[in-house]
Amino acid sequence: MIYLGKKLLSCTLFVYFLYIHFFLLKQNNFCDVKVRERILEESINNDLSSKGENLHIYEKTNVSVQTFIKKKERKNLSDNNINDKINNNNNYNNNNNNNIEDTTYYPTGNEKKENIFLKIFRYVKNWFPIKSSNNLKKTNINYEQVQEENEFSKYILQNNMSIETTKVCLIGSGGDSSHDLIKQFLLHNNVKYNRNYENDNSLNNKSGSIISSYKYYSEEIIQEPYIIDRDICNKKKNCKESTLNYENNPKTLIGNIIIQSDILKNEKIFNMNRHFVVCKYFGSIPKTNIKINQSTLIQHLIKCLDYCKMEGVQYIYIGYNIYAANNKLIEIMKKLREHKIIIVTSSGKIYDDDNNNDNNNFYNDNIYNNNIYNVHNDDKEKIKNHIKKKNKQNNYLYEYQRTQKDEEQKSNSSLYQNLENVISISGLIYTDSSKKNKNKNYIYDNEIKILDQKGNKKLNRNYISLFYFSYDTDIYEKIESDIIDDDHDLVSASFVNTLVLMHSINLKLSLGRLRKILNKSIVKREELRHLSNRAYYHDMMNTFEDSLNQRKRSYKIFYLELKNNKHKVLLSDANLKSMYQDNLPVNYNEEDHVKHNVEQETSVERDIYKNNENSNKNRKMDMDEGKGTYIQNKESHKYNIHYPYNRIKQSLLNDNTLNHKPYVSFLNMSYYNEDIEKRNYNIYDDPSYTYDQGITYDDNYYIDDHDIHTRKKRKISYDGEDNNDYHMYDDRDNLFHSNLGNNKYEDDGNVHREKEKDLEPRFLYDPFANIENRDLETVQELSELREKKSNNFYSRNHDNSSNMKRRRKEKKKKLKKVLRSKYDKIGNLERIRRKKKRRMIHKNKINKRRNMKRKNNELEERRNKQADKNSSSGNGKGKINGTRNSPKIKFKR
């Protein structure tokens, strides 16, 4: 007994030693963080193309909600090769269908390198129900950073951060108004709806105030199978039969895009400026409960895509993966690509099961197989016969002839590999380890299989672009995970909401720029630690920050065009129009200032417009494609500006990247039009006196108002005539009119620069001229001024309006100021030189005296030295030093 006790004690100590050792190992290798973030990566297909390269999953209890998005590469293919590529992909998928039942397990790279002690530790730990420590939360990624980004995303959704309304088309089965979260969302937004006692699930939206607005378009089967009644929908855009509720697809995706469950659980509302266009393509007959198959879904999908294109949406979200390919679908996809519409396919899947299953099986298997529709063989024959008769009578249906290839082709969103505007998202589908029979098999082609019969991890991922994990439980604990039925729906909805919000912040964000921003926000793989071999963390804050920076950069360029003293190419009218589509928030209170300036400029602009109406008939002055004139009556106070002062929308976003406060408001177009107007009326001045493009100026914002502006002459070419245009600064309304000269105007209204050889400055005055010639130059300048007084300041149309006289007087005064300032500068320079000359003369006299005195002293010293030498040698010569002019006595011994 003692011996057995010692052995038992030693075994116990050894087990505890292993437990402590691997507990520390677990802290460094594994994660217990509950996060809801996304992962994004390019070229996932190349990484996981080889056999056996499967994604590492820790345990079956560890698969739940966590999202990692994978985005595939798009190849630029011609339209002719799209059909061939799709067919090749479908043939490849059909070849893999024969190997569906293959349950061989290929271990991943991490599993091959797995330590044997770790396996023993897992086996021993299952005996002890020990909970994991909370300190493990910081072992993966950066827990504080994740929490900060979650708060940042909630702040964006809870506040209206969008600039412009984004139109999104949702194609699916609708939403569930009886759901607690959706019902709570509707109550928070004060949406008025009436319950239909016959059908409690129906919801009639009267106010249309869910977030922004909704528009419903029904492609449901109303009377007979395979027949879509569009008469009511054609007469009224909102069909009577179209409601927010779905009918037979509980795993809806639309409701998850409209709401955010995490925010609603905290009883908070998020505001996003979006306009939803909902097209319902799922449907069934309540009496017969006959389900539709893939050919009907393709017809419904084509009609919904066409309807979304007519509504002018920016994004289309399809509630299921494109199942089969036909010519009509490819044609509509090409049209959407031409309109630059981004299409997102969800992670839900539709498969056509040809097995003989009862309708009851559909409801019994609703837990894991909600997206699979089964049809009786007898019903199929009835439907086919019914279609042949109805297709001859109805012309409003798209012609769709089912062929043998259509029956064989099965692809998981094959269009996304060939069309760059299609983004396909697929997700992990949690399946139980219990196997079904052949008629109830849940393993399909291109579907990720997590578990096999033995409980091993297996991954079969062909054309999969999204997968997700959960870290709700410890990987060593036998605790069931919280499996949500519509996890993949939430994944797709979250990704679509991210794209829509990026577009709402920056309307000019193209597909290429969007891909670059998403790729730039990927965190390095080293920071993920042991999260996954193939996973990349997507930094949400960087995504929105880059979107805002792109928007700020476009506005900053426009600032430079109006405020910078360097010569830059001006923007065209089309670019200016697109710039002003964004309602830039104002950092200071300029509502009253803009209103006062608009009213103050009315009288002056009206006089200019009336006096030169005949000369501007052919010129397009309005910036909004001819929808309004430049100046209207004073009583109406309606000017052609994209965002008037009474429509300024204050936003939470402020562009603080600029170092100065602009005088020119993005909300008002009259200032820019005024510059064009003033330049246009100067083309009739005398071409003998011109100014140069290379004029320099200093704004009163940068330099004091009393500084003197040096004027240079410039030359403007417009239809072969020289233009006399002045670079003015009007102190009356604090508006700075930028230098718009030295440009040629084409027929399309774009501004183009002259060549560099025409930009050489030609000065009225030479700043390095000799002082002796200043009088001659002044006389010449005054003579030129007298000539201009009689000739140059009169326009060819001899206009005597008060405005033109005022402008001429201002030009004369400014020219005189230039002459006086030039003469004063020359005089001041001469005075300074005279003072310097007097100082030099005085210094020369003093130096001359010093030199003479120094020479006399040296001469006397030499003479005294010579006398001393003579006296010492006995020559008898000597010298008597006395006063400066004392007589010198020479003697001999």
UniProtKB/Swiss-Prot annotation:
Family: Belongs to the peptidase S8 family.
Annotated spans, Disordered: 787-893
Superkingdom field: Eukaryota
A GO CC term assigned to this protein in UniProt: plasma membrane
Disruption phenotype: Ookinetes fail to traverse the midgut epithelium resulting in a reduced number of oocysts in the gut epithelium of the mosquito host A.stephensi. Gametogenesis and ookinete development are normal. Growth rate and development of blood stage parasites are normal.
Organism: Plasmodium falciparum (isolate NF54)
Ranges of biased composition (kind: Basic and acidic residues): 821-831, 855-868
Cell compartments where the protein resides: Cell membrane
Biased composition (Basic residues): 804-820, 832-854
Native organism taxonomy: Eukaryota, Sar, Alveolata, Apicomplexa, Aconoidasida
Keyword line: Cell membrane, Membrane
Keyword Membrane among UniProt keywords: yes
Stated name of the protein: Inactive subtilisin-like protease SOPT
Biological role stated in the UniProt entry: Probable inactive serine protease which plays a role in ookinete traversal of the mosquito host midgut epithelium.
Gene name per UniProt: SOPT
Start-end of Polar residues biased regions: 791-803
Compositionally skewed regions (Low complexity) per UniProt: 869-882
